[in-house]
């Protein structure tokens, strides 16, 4: 495809609006409709029904973007900046991709990529469309919204013919061809509104926001604002850069909030507008505005320039936005409000979103414009929730800002969960698969789970209070619901799409809830299966993997015996993991579930040899011995393996430790050991070669250790323990490896810390003696983990090395399938599914809690549409097929390859390049490599799949795949407005 987007003619645009609204009640894919209540706020001699709208940027560049935002509740539109450089010249300066909004936002955009006349036409089209749909569809007062121009970047350019004409035409569009065309088209579409349409005001905008480049001298800023106030008589905002805070303040704030990896130097801070120049200039401009009878204020803030250091975007510098910008912007507001005694009007942009918008409004900061939040899943739909949060508050004319409230908000922002960077970066939510052309909706949580639990389905059952069926569904694939509901590494939660909203659904907790509430019913329903003849299974090792394997085999009716050398089953969870993390009762319930299928258990002595087991008639033998052997830490001194130490300490009832214990390593086991040492009376320290960000422990476990007072020493490696001290090498982080982890390198410096005992938690190992004694060669494992000895298998730690519980269950299931000979099949109850409309209703709603976590589940496998929501231009469209399924098509003409949809697609793909594409012209198709369709006429199409061919839709033997043909027919018959 080409990065060149082009505007939709107004007649086609309105045909889309009218047809889609009639068919579905949506407009440009936005599902959440705001209907104004009659309240409004005065501004610029006009009124706005809500204080929200899109900031000058990707969401206010095209007419459809503005209409989509209005439909969801926006009423203040800061349309995208225009300047003397435009069109192809400007687009050539913008790299692709240019937007990265997966977490805090970054972009390399600039002003509009259209020509200035095209941009003007887009804004006039949007203005006229909103005037009519507000009335016809009952969305609000046709005079209840405001368009605010954004112009830059120097006075010469602003006074030049191109931008000057734009300003004049936005102030009075009556003489423009576009305004006349809009009124003509609208009159044809809505003849009953002829008189109303005839009187649509041509005064599209009576206000402006001044945007200047970094390094613009204060004198130039003042000249621009003065010109717009006195010569154009426009209400004026001046946009300020966060650099006005000073380098030390910005660096300190970001570092303290976990954004220490964001790189920037002092040059912008030194070259941009300085505080001592800004305050007197703003005072002069305020007086000038008062003299002219106009409103003046500051737009806080512009995006923040930072270095591109990790290949985030193509150019060397990018502009930061979103949640990391909020603490900087609100600190700017704090200083401005105090400096001007609350009298300076502030228009906000810089990380505003649902969780802070009410506080901003209550402090007198409005209008509030947004960008990053509506570039995320939910997209424009997120605006409605913001509006509904603020609407019950008192609407009153601007009378000043509340300096005390802003100061409190600035202080709290630095510790607020929604603005802090997590200790550890979230893993990628993408799979390794390519997005299919059709039927692409998947639940990333399920794909991220080693056993592919039916997560959305059991969450929905729990939401409905059907805990018995929920647990039954869980145990179709998961033999250990209590253990995994308590200590699972929950990779599913790292993949959860809810992370793009606030935080993941608490999947593990809900699994435990289902286990607790559904256990009795499940146990009562279990019946001994009919015994399978000719197969007997022996499992050596009664830890999680062994229990799971026995469960799966026993459920299939295969005679199964577990051999465990300890007195009880349970392995590491029972004998090593501390009781404050998992109780014996929870472990026992999973064991009872397994034993309900008639599994025999032999505990308290070592298992017979493989040869002996075969002589006893066992046809399949599984080695499921855990990783009990200490990892090697090759230093002198008092060093113990963490597993044996924790096993010993678990037997202690009362605190029995003192002195200084240093745990070397940073996995979950290391966190457990440090917490045990701390609770048992010692001073506990975790020593790690890298930083917290790269620790392998789950963030939750890491945070618990921090909360309990465990000391962390980062960038350090042990050298020698002696005489109560541990000598350490000071490390530095080198270049990232292929996983993104930066390799630790010795700095040449050393230091010592108090230490009486070192615990080695650096990669536990499987005892290879058992393998060797039975002639098993570990490197020769075949399908389903069969070893070089026929009929003998390895699973869990014995197969992978130290493995998580759920990885052990996955191995156990594969082993059981090899024994049984056929895949296990089961049915998901109908109550576990929800409708497409119910799934869509969850989009755009930020929600930290609910009666049940199932309320927060987005049901991605029913309807994903992340690419639809996140596209500012609406270039990814969901079409409803005759069977009511939703399919995604990409509309080439509306896309500028910003790349935003790529961030949120759960596949290793780019929807703008990889989804089936609708082309507008033959030239567009030639310039693209996308798969897709071009309508040549009503019955003939050109389709590109593996190859490009023309097809006749009137013939039944046209060789088009049936599903692709159905999609093409649906586009032609129901969505012709997409290419009209």
Please describe what each predicted stretch is.
Residues 1-226, 231:
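N-terminal capping/small domains of soluble enzymes
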Residues 22-37, 242, 246-342, 377-395:
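Glycine/Thr-rich beta-alpha phosphate-binding loop at enzyme active sites
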Residues 64-68, 352-368:
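Catalytic cores of alpha/beta
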Residues 75-85, 242, 359-386:
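Glycine-rich phosphate-binding active-site loops on the catalytic face of alpha/beta enzymes
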Residues 317, 323, 374-375, 381, ...:
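Ferredoxin-type iron-sulfur electron-transfer modules and their immediate structural context
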Residues 531, 536-538, 588-635, 720-726, ...:
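Feature captures the FAD/FMN-dependent oxidoreductase FAD-binding
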Residues 540-561, 602-611, 625-633, 645-699, ...:
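Rossmann-like dinucleotide/flavin-binding elements
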Residues 559-562, 566-601, 674-719:
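Rossmann-like dinucleotide-binding cores of NAD(P)H-dependent redox enzymes
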């Amino acid at each position: 495809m080409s990065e060149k987007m082009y505007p939709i003619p107004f007649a086609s645009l309105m045909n889309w609006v009218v047809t889609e609204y009639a068919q579905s009640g949506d407009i440009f894919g936005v599902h959440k409709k705001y209907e104004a209540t009659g309240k409004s706020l005065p501004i610029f001699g006009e009124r706005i029904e809500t204080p929200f709208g899109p900031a000058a940027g990707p969401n206010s560049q095209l007419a459809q973007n503005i209409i989509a935002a209005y439909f969801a509740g926006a009423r203040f539109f800061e349309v995208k900046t225009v300047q003397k450089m435009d069109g192809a010249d400007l687009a050539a300066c913008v790299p692709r991709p240019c937007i990265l909004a997966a977490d805090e936002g970054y972009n390399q955009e600039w002003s509009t990529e259209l020509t200035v006349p095209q941009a003007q036409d887009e804004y006039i089209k949007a203005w006229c469309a909103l005037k009519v749909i507000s009335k016809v569809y009952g969305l609000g007062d046709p005079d209840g919204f405001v368009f605010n121009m954004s112009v830059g970047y120097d006075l010469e350019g602003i006074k030049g013919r191109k931008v000057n004409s734009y300003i004049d035409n936005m102030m009075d569009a009556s003489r423009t061809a576009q305004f006349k065309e809009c009124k003509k088209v609208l009159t044809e579409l809505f003849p009953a509104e002829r008189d109303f349409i005839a009187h649509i005001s041509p005064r599209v905008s009576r206000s402006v926001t001044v945007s200047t480049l970094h390094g613009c001298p204060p004198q130039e800023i003042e000249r621009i604002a003065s010109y717009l106030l006195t010569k154009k008589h426009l209400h004026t905002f001046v946009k300020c850069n966060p650099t006005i805070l000073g380098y030390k303040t910005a660096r300190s704030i970001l570092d303290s909030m976990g954004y220490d990896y964001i790189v920037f130097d002092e040059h912008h801070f030194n070259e941009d507008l300085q505080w001592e120049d800004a305050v007197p200039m703003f005072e002069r401009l305020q007086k000038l505005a008062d003299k002219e009878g106009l409103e003046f204020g500051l737009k806080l803030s512009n995006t923040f320039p930072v270095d591109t250091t990790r290949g985030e975007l193509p150019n060397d510098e990018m502009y930061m936005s979103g949640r990391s910008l909020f603490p900087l912007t609100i600190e700017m507001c704090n200083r401005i409000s105090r400096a001007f005694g609350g009298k300076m009007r502030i228009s906000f942009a810089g990380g505003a979103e649902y969780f802070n918008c009410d506080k901003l409004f209550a402090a007198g900061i409005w209008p509030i414009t947004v960008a990053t939040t509506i570039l995320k899943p939910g997209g424009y739909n997120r605006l409605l929730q913001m509006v509904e949060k603020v609407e019950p508050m008192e609407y009153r004319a601007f009378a000043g800002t509340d300096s005390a409230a802003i100061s409190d908000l600035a202080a709290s922002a630095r510790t607020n969960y929604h603005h802090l960077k997590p200790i550890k970066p979230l893993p990628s939510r993408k799979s390794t698969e390519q997005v299919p052309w059709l039927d692409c909706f998947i639940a990333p949580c399920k794909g991220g789970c080693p056993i592919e639990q039916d997560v959305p389905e059991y969450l929905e059952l729990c939401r409905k209070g059907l805990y018995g069926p929920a647990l039954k569904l869980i145990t179709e694939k998961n033999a250990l619901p209590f253990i995994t509901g308590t200590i699972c590494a929950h990779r599913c939660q790292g993949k959860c799409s809810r992370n793009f909203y606030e935080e993941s659904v608490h999947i593990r907790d809900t699994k435990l809830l289902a286990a607790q509430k559904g256990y009795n019913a499940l146990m009562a329903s279990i019946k001994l299966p009919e015994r399978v003849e000719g197969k007997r299974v022996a499992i050596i090792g009664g830890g999680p993997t062994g229990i799971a394997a026995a469960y799966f085999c026993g459920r299939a009716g295969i005679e199964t015996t577990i051999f465990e050398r300890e007195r009880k089953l349970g392995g590491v969870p029972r004998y090593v993991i501390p009781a404050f993390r998992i109780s014996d009762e929870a472990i026992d319930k999973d064991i009872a579930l397994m034993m309900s299928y008639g599994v025999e258990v032999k505990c308290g002595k070592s298992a017979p040899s493989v040869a002996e087991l075969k002589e006893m008639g066992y046809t399949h033998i599984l080695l499921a011995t855990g990783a009990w052997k200490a990892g090697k830490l090759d230093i002198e001194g008092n060093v113990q393996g963490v597993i044996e130490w924790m096993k010993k300490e678990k037997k202690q009832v009362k605190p029995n430790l003192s002195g200084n214990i240093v745990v070397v390593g940073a996995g979950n086991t290391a966190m457990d050991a440090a917490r045990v040492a701390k609770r048992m009376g010692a001073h506990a320290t975790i020593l790690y070669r890298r930083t917290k960000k790269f620790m392998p422990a789950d963030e939750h476990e890491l945070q618990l250790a921090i909360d309990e007072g465990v000391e962390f020493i980062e960038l350090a490696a042990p050298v020698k323990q002696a005489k109560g001290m541990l000598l350490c090498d000071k490390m530095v982080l080198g270049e990232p490896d292929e996983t993104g982890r930066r390799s630790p390198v010795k700095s040449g410096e050393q230091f010592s810390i108090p230490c009486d005992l070192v615990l080695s938690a650096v990669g536990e190992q499987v005892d290879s003696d058992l393998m060797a004694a039975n002639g098993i060669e570990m490197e020769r494992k075949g399908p389903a983990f069969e070893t070089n000895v026929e009929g003998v298998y390895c699973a869990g730690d014995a197969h992978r090395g130290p493995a998580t519980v759920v990885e052990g269950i996955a191995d156990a299931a594969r082993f059981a399938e090899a024994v049984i000979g056929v895949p296990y099949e089961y049915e998901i109850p109908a109550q576990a599914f929800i409708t497409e409309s119910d799934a869509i209703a969850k989009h755009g709603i930020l929600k930290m809690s609910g009666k049940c976590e199932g309320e927060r589940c987005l049901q991605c496998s029913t309807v994903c549409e992340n690419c639809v929501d996140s596209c500012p231009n609406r270039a990814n469209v969901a079409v409803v097929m005759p069977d009511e399924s939703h399919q995604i098509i990409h509309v080439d003409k509306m896309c500028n390859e910003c790349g935003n949809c790529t961030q949120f697609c759960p596949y290793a793909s780019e929807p703008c390049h990889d989804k089936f594409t609708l082309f507008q012209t033959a030239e567009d198709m030639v310039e693209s490599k996308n798969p897709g369709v071009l309508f040549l006429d009503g019955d003939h199409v050109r389709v590109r799949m593996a190859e490009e061919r023309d097809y006749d839709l009137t013939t039944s033997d046209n060789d088009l795949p049936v599903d692709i043909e159905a999609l093409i027919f649906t586009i032609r018959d129901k969505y012709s407005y997409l290419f009209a």
